[in-house]
Amino acid sequence: MLEESVEGFVARWRAHAARGTAFARLEGSPLLEVALGETVVQLFERTGPYDAPAGPVRLVVHGVATRWSLDGSEGPSLAALGPARLRVSGRVVERDADVVVVDAGVPVVVGLMPADDGPSLPEAGDWITCETLAPAQAFVIREPVRRAVASPDDQV
């Protein structure tokens, strides 16, 4: 099981949240377009109400792959293959059962669903290259809003 709840998933993987820049979008749309490093990707936002503001954002990027290779010949990279599909290549920095965190220039949490004839699950330190199934997802980390302390002068 990849997740029991959105909140549980965010709590488990928030340490691997990526920093990016979200672009403006239609109000209420779950499709989030975000620049991660030098790549612009479209992700399905799982942490409604789908109101992540345009501008700087922290998010857990998540995809599921059924096939992968243990190959790092091209180095770390993240590429968009189409709406909500990613090509991920990089070093595995953490593994928890069948979920790995890949350093693809930005952290990407990838759920691996192994095929009977596929390679074994990678371990931390291994290189992996995979293509995620659609839809790749974004779990936006909502930072608490810090309000300035009102001064007596503000009340005049």
Predicted regions mapped to residue ranges:
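Structural detector for short beta-strands of small beta-barrel domains
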Residues: 1-27, 78-98, 128-130, 156
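Acidic (E/D-rich), amphipathic helical modules within compact regulatory domains
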Residues: 27-75, 81
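Beta-strand secondary-structure signal
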Residues: 31-33, 58-60, 89, 101, ...
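Short loop/beta submotifs within extracellular cysteine-rich repeat domains
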Residues: 39-42, 67-69, 108-111, 137-140
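Residue-level recognition of conserved beta-strand positions in structured domain cores
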Residues: 45, 61, 103-104, 112, ...
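Beta-strand elements of well-folded, non-transmembrane domains
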Residues: 63-65, 92, 136
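Short, solvent-exposed interaction modules
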Residues: 67-122
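Mixed-charge, glycine-accented linear interaction segment located at domain edges/termini
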Residues: 109-156
